[in-house]
């Protein structure tokens, strides 16, 4: 089943064709650590986490890089307002960020920080100067010459002339829409030495440098919130492809807005909800479920009712797991009846539908609807029939669901002793199905076991198994 993904560059869904076979290299823009994360950040990070989990479920090796911007105008301003050293600001809010990721069960492969890559950033800028794509102003700041990159605006659809950056630095630029690669030092600000004098990196150059450092000159997915399309990602693309002279990123992926009771989150409205407060009130599993109940490209509105609905739905899922586990513990008592076989076939089709939804631009909302159809079969059929095979299929469906959604980890840690007995019983039932020439179901069971790391070995009249 081909995975397809929406590419902001081109604005269409395209087949996922990776740079390297069965490997996905992904860079997601992380936070600027000057304040607490809000629930919008949480949505972005969880959405990309679900993508990573599904790709891994499908057998891809995923390398995920998510940066930490630890030097920026906002950090300097926060330090000046609070009277604290800028490094103290960075350390405090970095801990808040990493703690949120831990609670949300998000694991990042590489977490580069800007200040650890200053030398590489300087080298990147110098190469742009050498190629004629950047210039040094009298102040010692370095700017990207936007006119030197003809396809500027292709990603965002924004015309360069429409970009208003303010008047402070316009006089020293060739054009008002040129953007800073290196910012000359001002008294009281942190700085690093460079060929152009004391200063610090601009925002956009940081991500280009770090993504190439960890993922190479061409990688598969570059993502972030929809608000980053312009100017951040547009500028990243311009400077990176100007340097390389070729395509840099294959797929640009963006998570849509999160609103608060139909209003945009903003400090002026006083409606920003810190992520740590939401985690404390609702818990990570409810938040993850709620985030993923909507397609990542659809706007999501925060209100108490929607979180309560997510909590109740998650409780129903856990209750279904309890029923399934009880039926499995009872073991197989009889051959499946015709009605049971139909339930089994329905579950198999719903598992396929789950994968079809996830394969079509990671549609978690649609995928979730199929999981709830399986849950309805658990409550409406399996808890009364006590059919072992139906329960096993439902268990596998919910296991795959949880691998992607990450909302019921505590429900999926059986002991090795129990696991061995369950596999023995499943393999025996599969063997009986083979003897009855019910090959479609026996093949499905083999595939389920293989997906769980269990290899089935068939002989003429029996089957055995081992862990792969």
Swiss-Prot record:
Binding site for Zn(2+): 29, 207, 232, 236
Manner of cofactor binding, per the entry note: Binds 1 zinc ion per subunit.
Subcellular location: Cytoplasm
Molecular function GO labels: ATP binding; cysteine-tRNA ligase activity; zinc ion binding
Keywords assigned by UniProt, alphabetized: Aminoacyl-tRNA synthetase, ATP-binding, Cytoplasm, Ligase, Metal-binding, Nucleotide-binding, Protein biosynthesis, Zinc
Broad class of enzyme this protein falls into: ligase
Major localization listed first in the record, in broad terms: cytoplasm
Entry coiled-coil feature ranges: none
Protein name in the entry: Cysteine--tRNA ligase
Organism of this sequence: Sulfurisphaera tokodaii (strain DSM 16993 / JCM 10545 / NBRC 100140 / 7)
